[in-house]
Amino acid sequence: MDAPARLLAPLLLLCAQQLRGTRAMNDIGDYVGSNLEISWLPNLDGLIAGYARNFRPGIGGPPVNVALALEVASIDHISEANMEYTMTVFLHQSWRDSRLSYNHTNETLGLDSRFVDKLWLPDTFIVNAKSAWFHDVTVENKLIRLQPDGVILYSIRITSTVACDMDLAKYPMDEQECMLDLESYGYSSEDIVYYWSESQEHIHGLDKLQLAQFTITSYRFTTELMNFKSAGQFPRLSLHFHLRRNRGVYIIQSYMPSVLLVAMSWVSFWISQAAVPARVSLGITTVLTMTTLMVSARSSLPRASAIKALDVYFWICYVFVFAALVEYAFAHFNADYRKKQKAKVKVSRPRAEMDVRNAIVLFSLSAAGVTQELAISRRQRRVPGNLMGSYRSVGVETGETKKEGAARSGGQGGIRARLRPIDADTIDIYARAVFPAAFAAVNVIYWAAYAM
């Protein structure tokens, strides 16, 4: 019994060592993502032992040089109302930490994202971000690679909503410049120095992006040193990218409907003046539709004090639509005024003819030798009062009455000639040519001022 017991003890010890080795292999497999030889692996526990992650590499010495690089995955949304855009990027940071160097091999070690919590990391943040979050499906989207000389590559995937100041004076024919500013939150230029990676000549993925409302025309990188009186100088890296708005969708949704509404208001110039309900309803409908179009277009824009190019065009169209309605009111007023004048002429013409006939009879009697007293007595007895006035006005005119009558007729005739109403049909004929020509001229000036 003693001999089997002595053999069983070493066997159990061997099994325990084998199990421990298997677990160690599994743990290493969590850190190494490839089929590599295990013999070259550094002793991670030895590297981490005594490692102070709260202090930067080389504390008390020269600053840490951190290289940054960006890859743009998508630009999801650009909002003019909130002056912001949403971007998903891969942020790559690289620096050297001599405390983690292992020079007995030339292999780069790929580590699990859980190892990140044991390392010192630059406190990089997005200066103009309104909100941001990391991705964690199916695991945390973080990458860490360790080179033998202690150089660390740290990559994370971030989605951030970033502020972008926009000048909308030429909207929707505007071009905007948005920025992504990266800076250290707590380390000044004495502790950390940022610079764009040498491989960052262009941004991978940005050239292939297809945006709904914009086209990315160009981008550039800048480096500057921000000076804060209370905290010192902080290095800042900025990505500037220029956006040109796609005008096609606005021409279809805003400009073409406005032009069609203006052209629709001109239809009233070909409708008869007698069709009052048709012309009035057409004019009011175009005015209200233009108002609705203006309100709906402004709903997606900020309430800014600047007048935008689209607002200018809407008001141009609104003035032409309203002017077409006013044109009909003016033409209808002239037509109604002419009708009243004709009615007055028809009523006064028979009365004037009767006065002339009575005056001729009285003049004939006077020429035949009838005495003035007899003529006066007969006129007083037989001739009505209006005939007396007519006779005096025709037959007994002195020089003064002629002069006064000529002066009155000359003054009133000149005013009436200047204020004589124009025929309504003539107004419509002029409007058919003047309105389209004026609208075309205004369009040429507008597009030359804003589009070129």
Swiss-Prot record:
CDD domains: LGIC_ECD_GABAAR_delta (cd19001), LGIC_TM_GABAAR_delta (cd19055). GO terms for cellular component: axon; chloride channel complex; dendrite; GABA-A receptor complex; GABA-ergic synapse; glutamatergic synapse; neuronal cell body; plasma membrane. Glycans are attached at N103, N106. InterPro entries: GABAA/Glycine_rcpt, GABAAd_rcpt, Neur_chan_lig-bd, Neur_chan_lig-bd_sf, Neur_channel, Neuro-gated_channel_TM_sf, Neuro_actylchol_rec, Neurotrans-gated_channel_TM. Residues 25-251, 299-308, 450-452 are extracellular. It catalyses: chloride(in) = chloride(out). Its main location: membrane. It holds the Pfam family Neur_chan_LBD. One of its GO terms (biological process) is signal transduction. The chain crosses the membrane at residues 252-271, 276-298, 309-331, 427-449. Changing R220C: In GEFSP5; uncertain significance; does not affect receptor current amplitudes. Disulfide bonds join C164-C178. Belongs to the ligand-gated ion channel (TC 1.A.9) family. Gamma-aminobutyric acid receptor (TC 1.A.9.5) subfamily. GABRD sub-subfamily. It is linked to Generalized epilepsy with febrile seizures plus 5: A rare autosomal dominant, familial condition with incomplete penetrance and large intrafamilial variability. Patients display febrile seizures persisting sometimes beyond the age of 6 years and/or a variety of afebrile seizure types. This disease combines febrile seizures, generalized seizures often precipitated by fever at age 6 years or more, and partial seizures, with a variable degree of severity. This is Gamma-aminobutyric acid receptor subunit delta.
